């Protein structure tokens, strides 16, 4: 008997018993609430509603989805291929990202051999907690998919199913990545993992490739299903948890400390710590500072469990503290926030050093040995900052992400 991967739960449906009679107004209200909460009436609203995995021997469900190329893709577009490989993957999951290169290689290796590889992003982007983005630069929205595709020079059709999850509901992927291999008649012959280890150098079994090779050779697939191990599919019902996490963070206290020139010098050295240090200098009178601040706060929550401290330093005058506090509270800035205690901002510039000319915003990433890893004078490009962070963060929970962010493919 198959051992299901974590997150795969058979669908159950509840019914209102025939003996219950509801006033028409109440019934209409219930229906309106249901449709308002989700546009698709089959979308899971709880873990009990998660669809089952498509069964071996089933026909490939049709799809009509927008790709990152701006075109619609359907099952019929791949009718000429002898074998169709459909893989559910995403951007935010560290395990999923570690498979991008292998999926790209799979696509390349079988090009011209009658094999089509199609990748579908089936997560609900709004169901992803900020804390689940601690190893990524991006979420799972359509625009973010395009950014990842271009950044990694990917070569396969990458399709978006995040708004309704209509296709994911038909296939029932439990995790990312989750592969489905269909024969020429589009009968499912294999579903499960791509191989047996997220770290490519440790993978010894390659079930997806084996299934493709067997079908091309006209042979039965020996291993028909395996557990798909990775980040669980983010079904719509998980939106509530993502919102609750934000609300919980918003309730944390906002603090502001006064910092002397000497304290800024000590901050710059970043000694006696096992964390990277990201510092953003700003002021309430600086338009670009105000504009980019929400992105900075998003990073605070994304990387809260990683080895990095994010600090903001306001160069407002000390008697403007109340304005600084007000803004920080509006932004729910729960990280460490400083206000330079001197009345001459040039003293702050001199104390911190690092060739800062004094203009704000000024953002700098400092390593664990005090080395400057990244800096930008002027408007911050949040994507560049995140990638600089990820490239320099050590493997603090498991092995593989440091190599991923420092690889080129």
Residue positions per predicted region:
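Short pre-active-site segment immediately N-terminal to redox-active cysteine/selenocysteine motifs
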Residues: 82-84, 89-92, 275-277, 281-285, ...
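Conserved redox-active cysteine motifs that mediate thiol-disulfide chemistry
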Residues: 90-102, 281-298
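N-terminal secretory signal peptides that target proteins for export/translocation
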Residues: 1-18
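Thiol-/selenol-based redox modules, centered on thioredoxin-like
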Residues: 183-256, 359-409
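Bacterial N-terminal signal peptides
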Residues: 23-34
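Thiol-based oxidoreductase modules, predominantly thioredoxin-like and allied folds used
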Residues: 114-139, 154-164, 307-321, 333-345
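A short beta-strand-turn-helix
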Residues: 63-84, 255-277, 297-303
